[in-house]
A protein has these predicted regions:
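Sequence/structural segment immediately N-terminal to covalent heme-attachment motifs in c-type
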Residues: 20-42, 50-51, 114, 196
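Gly/Gly-Pro-rich "capping" loops immediately C-terminal to redox-active cysteine motifs
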Residues: 25, 37-82, 102, 239
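C-terminal capping alpha-helices of c-type cytochrome domains
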Residues: 79-130, 541, 546-547, 556
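Beta-propeller domain segments
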Residues: 134-188, 258, 319-368, 375-518, ...
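Surface loop/turn motifs at the tips and blade-to-blade linkers of beta-strand repeat domains
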Residues: 194-199, 239-245, 288-296, 369-373, ...
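Hydrophobic core register within WD40 beta-propeller blades
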Residues: 205, 250, 304, 377-380, ...
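Conserved beta-propeller blade signature
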Residues: 212-216, 259-262, 312-316, 388-392, ...
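Asp-box/WD-like beta-propeller blade repeats and closely related beta-sheet repeat scaffolds
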Residues: 237, 246-247, 251-253, 267-309, ...
């Protein structure tokens, strides 16, 4: 009888271990796990650990750099009851204005499910370790303290360090107010000023033929237009469209005489009829792509670019997870059959058609794979001269302070760029060892490597419009400006700047140079986070800073 009871208990435990995950766990894995853990150590990623979060006081995890807004809410007694979590998750910035939580959960059933799951993640917590104290980088290379305009960088693929050479830090920035009189540092011969401010968390500027600047605001679900009479400062700020679902990438089509503004939502693409000079959308949008992928969590930015001839629409889709640890060793179909449908190196499971660039006709039809293995191609452009597609990629986390590098690269049709099994060529991720040896020699080495964990979300090829009064010197023509949003997975902060990527005949040389720096106050505090760049109609460079809610304008000290 005793043996029967023990056997029954063992079977029960086995069944529980193999049970399908709850809806809340599935939602958490697909939407939250890229930024939060639920382990008893309260390990931090971009966000704080959520073990024991239900019933916990707000901003209570030691050593995590909470925003002032959330810290004050916790000091005032805010506690994460189920009810408080429901209110917060519905609209984080409405509940706690100034929080860094970028998006909410609009579906009440999904909120209830994920809160129920978080309530099960409770027990005896381990003491969290201070990231900055325990996770020092192997050297000072790439540290914010070394940054200044003009500094050169060249990271070589043949000189990468080994995985886990340093601890993996959860060291997100604490956003501070810009000190009075503080301005970004730019090279001699340039000036910097404020083009627009009080914008919230805007991203990805797009210049219209008349010089208007479109901005996407994912958290608000809206598109905003900036207009300037003299080019120095925006004097008109107009909400173009609202009611969108985490809008990010935008494109005007066709480029020479635009008829539509395309907008990439988190899981669809829509377009608005457009005439040059429109400050408000003309009616409701037309859906061009009804569903981008089966999963939409994890990396939620979607970027659009059109081929030079306007016939192909490229759409970048970031990964659902950090490194696809849960998808298993084989796709649901024979590998050859899977890759015939989704392309060489295509992942599966929750990562199906993720970490990829997809291609469509301009009307959203004729869907096809273009390239795979690009973990999060946030910045995506078509080179205005060569017509080649470029991506700036946020690479994976938790391999150490200086591995792997982020990068910018030309993207070729049918090619594989490494994620999740490899990085920067034939370097195998030790967490996925031995799963895809067939891809080792098929993995493309990117063109220019960027300091690890810099987070490069937006870029532009510098080409001054004809007759531009504030055109940069000729030596800048054809180079790429790249925004580095800044690190969280590094013991000593890096990024938070704009760099110049050197080009030769439309091809990156491998070198880049600091161009705009000075937004980091300490290893804890920053007052700005460059998110994207655009060339204004007068030739000035506009830098969208979604940390400070500012668009900066950089121009030569002397106009042409």
């Amino acid at each position: 009888m005793r043996h029967t009871t023990i056997a029954a208990l063992c079977l029960a435990f086995t069944a529980a271990a193999n049970a399908a995950p709850s809806p809340g766990q599935t939602f958490f894995t697909q939407n939250c796990a890229s930024c939060h853990t639920v382990d008893p150590k309260l390990s931090a990623l971009a966000g704080p650990g959520l073990f024991n979060v239900v019933g916990r006081k707000a901003a209570a995890v030691p050593n995590f750099n909470y925003t002032d807004a959330l810290t004050k809410a916790g000091a005032a007694g805010k506690t994460w009851t189920r009810e408080e979590l429901d209110v917060f998750l519905r609209d984080p910035n409405k509940d706690v204005p100034g929080t860094a939580m970028p998006i909410g959960v609009s579906d009440p059933k999904q909120r209830a499910a994920v809160i129920a799951y978080l309530a099960t993640q409770a027990g005896q917590a381990s003491a969290p370790v201070a990231a900055a104290a325990s996770a020092k980088p192997t050297d000072q290379a790439g540290a914010w303290t070394q940054d200044k305009p003009g500094d050169l960088h060249h990271i070589k693929p043949t000189e990468l360090i080994q995985p886990y050479a340093s601890d993996s830090a959860g060291n997100g920035p604490k956003l501070a107010a810009r000190p009075e009189g503080a301005m970004p540092a730019v090279p001699p011969g340039f000036t910097v000023g404020i083009y627009a401010d009080k914008l919230g968390k805007s991203r990805l500027p797009l210049r219209a033929p008349n010089g208007d600047i479109f901005l996407s605001e994912a958290a608000k679900g809206q598109i905003t237009v900036l207009r300037s009479k003299d080019g120095a400062k925006a004097d008109t700020v107009s909400v173009y469209a609202t009611g969108l679902s985490r809008p990010y990438g935008m494109a005007l089509w066709p480029a020479d005489k635009p008829q539509y503004l395309y907008v990439a939502n988190v899981n669809s693409v829509v377009r608005y009829p457009y005439s040059v000079g429109d400050l408000k959308a003309k009616g409701e949008p037309e859906t061009v792509i009804g569903k981008i992928s089966d999963t939409s969590g994890g990396h939620v930015t979607r970027t659009i670019a059109f081929s030079k001839d306007g016939k192909t629409m490229f759409l970048s889709v970031g990964s659902a997870t950090n490194v696809a640890a849960g998808i298993g060793a084989r796709p649901p179909q024979p590998l050859a059959q899977w890759e015939a449908k989704y392309g060489v190196g295509a992942a599966w499971g929750e990562e199906t058609e993720r970490a990829a660039v997809l291609a469509f006709d301009a009307d959203g039809k004729n869907r096809r794979a273009y390239a795979n293995g690009l973990r999060n191609c946030v910045g995506m452009i078509v080179h205005p001269t060569t017509g080649e597609l470029f991506c700036s990629v946020n690479e994976r986390d938790e391999l150490g302070d200086n591995l792997p590098p982020d990068y910018i690269t030309r993207v070729k049709q049918g090619r594989f760029y490494g994620w999740p099994w490899y990085y920067i060529g034939a370097n195998e991720d030790p967490r996925l060892k031995g799963i895809r040896p067939d891809l080792k020699n098929k993995t493309i080495v990117p063109d220019t490597l960027i300091q690890s964990h810099s987070a490069p979300p937006g870029m532009v090829v510098y080409q001054a419009p004809r007759g531009a009064q504030h055109a940069f010197p000729k030596e800048y023509e054809g180079d790429i400006f790249l925004a580095l949003h800044g690190s969280w997975n590094r013991g000593i902060r890096t990024g938070y700047k704009v760099v110049r990527v050197f080009m030769k005949n439309g091809v990156p040389t491998g070198q880049y140079q600091d161009f705009m720096t000075g937004m980091v106050l300490s290893d804890r505090d920053v007052w700005g986070r460059p998110a994207a760049v655009e060339v204004a109609a007068d030739g000035a460079l506009l830098v969208v800073d979604d940390g400070g809610g500012v668009v900066w304008r950089i121009a030569p000290a002397r106009s042409n």
